[in-house]
Amino acid sequence: MIKTTLLFFATALCEIIGCFLPWLWLKRNASIWLLLPAGISLALFVWLLTLHPAASGRVYAAYGGVYVCTALIWLRVVDGVKLSLYDWTGALIALCGMLIIVAGWGRT
């Protein structure tokens, strides 16, 4: 379970970086060269999703919970926005959903 969760967090980080770099290019007039590491990051994101031993839809559903938590960490660390009680509550609910889905992988 810990290995799966850590893999999901790495996957989410790759997805967020892969989307953030083009955002910088489009919104902040950053270098177009940021699209190259963005593409690599998104390719790594896709590859990491294939490393889970469950059906793709189940992996995507469980991953969504970790993505929510990772995006909120990004919001706090990179964007500098203080998280609200609603952010924390939503993250906890999403993470619990992920844990329930992953716990059932070997039982279905």
Curated annotation (Swiss-Prot):
**Localization, UniProt:** Cell inner membrane
Question: Any one cellular component term from GO for this entry?
Answer: plasma membrane
Topologically, how does it sit relative to the membrane?
Multi-pass membrane protein
The main place the protein resides is membrane
Transmembrane stretches in the record are 6-26, 31-51, 61-81, 85-105
- Stretches in topological domain Periplasmic: 1-5, 52-60, 106-108
Cytoplasmic side: which ranges? 27-30, 82-84
Q: What keywords sit in the KW lines?
A: Cell inner membrane, Cell membrane, Membrane, Transmembrane, Transmembrane helix
Organism domain of life: Bacteria
Sorted alphabetically, which PANTHER family does this protein's record hold? UPF0060 MEMBRANE PROTEIN YNFA (PTHR36116:SF1)
Cited HAMAP family: UPF0060
Which family would the database say this protein is a member of? Belongs to the UPF0060 family.
Name of this chain's protein = UPF0060 membrane protein YnfA
